[in-house]
Amino acid sequence: MSEELHSDLIASIFGGKPAKIEEFFSKWNFANAAVSKFDMANSAKNELGDRICEVIENGELTHVLLETIKILSREKDGLEGLLNDPLCDKILAFAELSSNENNSKTVHTLMEAQKCLINTLFHSQRMRDRFYANPKTGENLQFFLGEFEENRRKTSSIDWIRLLNPVQAAEIWYFYHRIAFIATALGREFQKNWANDPKTIDSLLLAVEICTNRSENSTQDINRATEALKTFFNVFCHFHGDVKAIDHKNAAKTCQILRDAICSDVLTDDVVQSAIHCLSVPPLPMVLSVLCGKNSKNNGGENEEEKFFVEELSNMQLTEAILMHLDKQLTKVVALLLNDAPNQQQNPMLSAEASTLTDLVGPYFQVLARLCTDSKYVRRYCRIRVIPPLVSEEVQKRPEENNTLRGRIARIMMLPSSTKDVAAEFLFIICKRSVNRMIKYLGFGHSAGHLANLGLLGQINQPKHASDSEDSETEDYNQIKDSVNPVTGAIYPSDHGSALAGMSEEQKEYEAMKLVDAMNQMMETGIVKPGTIGDDGKIREVSHVLELLKNAPEPAPAENSDSDEE
């Protein structure tokens, strides 16, 4: 690291000729190229910002001083003093965002200004205020996002864009997408403006569309597409009503581009994940004719059933791709959780990584739930893939212990994360919103929370509905289903014999009353608060333990209701 920048040194440097200033800061920038913390007083940063602002428009110094600001802006502390309002405005101008004039005399100056703006937008409220205050910044930024595609670049109305070579254009285009991502992540009013601008979809998704139309993409192309998708999510994720940017035409176009990205064989998992997140935003309708194709009616024939099955599943490419990527992500989460269990004290970061991955799969479940709600074909397909007919081997272990997609989803539902709620809703939908079916596949322990939230606990003891359609239980499962513990979803241990075996009726009554007294004492001291199912189907607290026995329903005879009939 070079010497500390203190006030006397700063005054001495800027008191000299431009060549001296350029020489000093070139050396300082090189020495601090990888540094992110600086032993520099805030007063010195204030003075440095003022001095830089005075001379940065000197063509000899612009590039080197922008690089100095970029390096210093890695550290948030003291940055507001370094960035006075005039300096912020000049950085925006050099990034070609605050006016329609060509302020950067060289490509390298423009790129340095972009990098500088990326750091300062992220760390400085002052820079964000100046950025959002100028309506031109958003307009110019959105224009640039759509102007660097090769054919558009060659015919651009802006001279300096036409003169760029492909490598320079790709780099500058990527940096504008980075700026857009940060700007939309931190400015709600900025999000609103773009969400209601019809040009937003074309500007943002052009970079993604280009990648989906190629058989091979560079790392730069992939990174740019990822930034574009993350920006799209930022813009629309907070809106729950209609927005002007997503009309019927743009909705269909967006769904097509996102579908192509998710089903692509050449894009990375990061791009696919970002595309799935974009598909989950509330304002975007599920255009089934685009996402799943049109299901033609069967005209009959010798192989009518086979023809229907093939036609139905041939449109499930998107659904299968989402399920495949979901399973891949859940496998990573479960592996982290299994590794974390014995080492939680020694490696707390592992828990954080598992938690982050869990949060990132929430939108996968949201998309699947919306698709299943809108399409019975998707719902049937997901049921086949996630909860196929049970076999006896699967209930030898608890649901979360099975090495299946169903097992991994059950494992996620045990975590203190919002993802467990959307995962439970997805499973409930493919269970045809059947309380008994959900308990059968997940056990009451995993299902109770979601059913309580929906006020459906009161339906647990209702009789099942008979159906003559295809049974969802295999023959070997039927042979052992009476041995399955409905709470855990697994068969009882072989030695689970009753604790009351061998007792007389008087002994049983005595033990029962002891239990009642013990529970009542715990209730009075506040150790436990037993609950029962209220009239609204939700849990309410009981005043006495005997309320738990009052009006207890008789067990209803079990009938088959687990068909796939819609």
Swiss-Prot record:
UniProt keyword list: Chaperone, Cytoplasm, Developmental protein, Guanine-nucleotide releasing factor
Annotated GO CC locations: aster; cell cortex; cytoplasm; kinetochore microtubule; spindle
InterPro entries found in the cross-reference section: Chaperone_Ric-8_A/B, Gua_nucleotide_exch_fac_Ric8
Subcellular location: Cytoplasm, Cell cortex
One Pfam family named in its UniProt record: Ric8
GO BP: G protein-coupled receptor signaling pathway; protein localization to cell cortex; regulation of establishment of cell polarity; regulation of feeding behavior
Top-level taxonomic group: Eukaryota
Molecular functions (GO terms): G-protein alpha-subunit binding; guanyl-nucleotide exchange factor activity
Tissues and organs where the protein is expressed, per its UniProt entry: Present throughout the nervous system in juveniles and adults (at protein level).
Function: Chaperone that specifically binds and folds some, but not all, nascent G alpha proteins prior to G protein heterotrimer formation, promoting their stability and activity. Also acts as a guanine nucleotide exchange factor (GEF) for G alpha proteins by stimulating exchange of bound GDP for free GTP. Able to facilitate synaptic transmission in the nervous system probably by activating G(q)-alpha (egl-30). Also able to activate the G(s)-alpha in synaptic signaling network.
Subunit structure: Interacts with GDP-bound G-alpha proteins goa-1 and gpa-16. Does not interact with G-alpha proteins when they are in complex with subunits beta and gamma.
Family: Belongs to the synembryn family.
Protein name as annotated: Chaperone ric-8
